[in-house]
Amino acid sequence: MEQLSLLDLMQATRGQLSAAASLDQPIDQICTDSRSLQPGSIFWALRGETFDGHDFLPQAMARGASVCVVDAAHADAATGPTLVVKDTGKALMDFAAWYRGTLDALVIGLTGSVGKTTTRDMIHVALASEFEGIRSRKNFNNTIGLPLSLLDADHRHEFIVLEMGAARIGDIAELAAIASPEVGVISAIGPAHLQTFGSLNNIIQGKGELLESLPTSGFAVLPGDDMILRQMADRAPCPVIFVGEEDDNHLRATRVRASYEGLSFRVDGVDFMVPVCGRHHLTNALCAIAIAREIGVNLQSVAQGLERFEPIDGRSRLRTIGSWTVIDDTYNASPLSVAAACRMLPDLELPGIGRRVLVLGDMRELGSAANEEHRRIGELAASLKIDLVVACGNHADEVARGAEAAGMDSHSIAAAPDLETVKAVLDCWLEPGDVILVKGSRATRMERVLEWLTERARLETAMRGEQRRYCA
C-alpha cells in the first residue's frame, strides 16, 4: 500500500478519530489478524460469522498497533488511538474504493462459476512478462478479501487482477463498485452455489453484473464457445473479445492437445505449452492471452510466461505418489468442475498406465439439485469408461446409482459414508500404475485422501526395503 495519512483514512471512511491520534501520522500497512500484526500497522477490527476482531483489541495494542479501526459500539474498548466508524466492514470497502481512485494501474475483474483462481494466475503470468502487477491474495474474493487485495497495490504496479466471488445476486455489483474494473472476464457459467443463488438464471444474472460495471473505454473477455456467455455479451457497454476453438471467436486456438505433459495449442501462429492437466484449462489460458494481446504484450513473451505456470495445490495438480499418478483437484467441486476433471482421465497417456480411478466427495451448496447433479456425475464417469468410482459423503449413493444406471459394473463402484470407508476400499482396490483423480467440495477435505495415499506409499516403500534387507 502507498504511504497515506490518518487524515486520508478518516476522510475515506467518514470516521471519527480519537484525540490520542495524530492526523498526519503515516500509514502503509493494514492488518485484520492481531496474531500477525507488525508494530505501526493499522488494526482493522472486522466481524465474521465465527469471530469478532473487537475481541482482540488488547492483543493488537500490545503488539504495537498505531491505530485501531472499530465500530461505534466498541469505541471505548481500545486503550489507544482509534478511528471510530459505523461499520468496520463497510468502512474497509469504502477505504479500498477510495484508494482505487488513487491508482493508475489497469484493474482486471474476474468472476465465474469455476476456473477463477487458475484464470487469475494465468492472467498474472501472461502480463508479468512485460508489466509489473499483482493479483488477489490466495482466495480473497469477497467483500473483505477483495479490498485487502486492492490495498496491496502501490504506484509500481501497472495491473491488478482481482478475483470476484458470488453467492447471490448483487455480490458482484458490490465488489465491482469497490474495484472499478476496466477489464472484465467471466471464466465459465454453471450450477455452483445453487443453494444461495436459487437457479442457473440467477447465476447468469449475478455474474453478468461484472460486465455491466465496465466503462465504455474498457473491454470484456468471454469464452465464445459457450452460448450462455455469448448471450451475456450484450450486457457489456464496451467491446467484447470472444475466445475459444470455434471459427467465429476473435481469438482462436488450433492444434489443441491435452496430455500428461500439459496443454498445447496454437494462437496467431504462436505455439503454447501450458503445464496443466486437462483440456478444460484451454479457456482459462485463452482469456489470459486475449488480455495480453489486447494491451500489447508480445505473444511469444506470453507463451514463455505460461510455459512457467505452476498450478496451485488442489487445482488439477499432477502428482506422483508411490506407484500411482494422482490428480490433486481437492480444492473445491461443482458439477461443472467435476465433469471437466473427469474428462481429464482419458487424456492422460502414460507408459504402463493402469486403471483410471475417480475418488469423489460431495459437491456442496447445490440445494434441491444435489441428487440429480450427483447422479449425472456417476453417469458421466460410466460414459468415459472410468474403471473405478469411489464416492464419499451424503450423496455417494446418487453417484453410484448414476454410474450403475449408465452401465458401469456394480463391482467397480463404491458408495462410502465416510473417509475411513474410502481408505478401506482403496486399500483393497488400488494397484500399481493406477491414475487416481481426487476431488470434492472444500468442506469435504478430500486432501486427506492424498495424505493417506502418501502414507500408504511410504509404508510400502519401507516394507520393500525391509524385505530386501532380510533377503540379503
Question: Which sequence ranges carry the predicted segments?
Answer:
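ATP-dependent carboxylate-amine ligase
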Residues: 1-18, 39-42, 52, 121, ...
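Active-site regions of enzymes building and remodeling cell-envelope glycoconjugates
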Residues: 78-87, 237-242, 410-413
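Short secondary-structure boundary segments
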Residues: 70-73, 188, 224, 393, ...
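Alpha-helical segments flanking ligand/cofactor-binding loops in enzyme cores
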Residues: 35, 58-59, 173, 201, ...
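Acidic-glycine-rich active-site phosphate/pyrophosphate-binding loop
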Residues: 119-124, 252-271, 314-319
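Residue-level signal for inorganic ion chemistry
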Residues: 9, 41, 60, 95, ...
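Phosphate-binding loop of NTP-binding sites
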Residues: 10-11, 91-219, 224, 230-236, ...
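N-terminal leader/targeting and accessory segments in enzymes
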Residues: 1-94, 98, 366, 379-380, ...
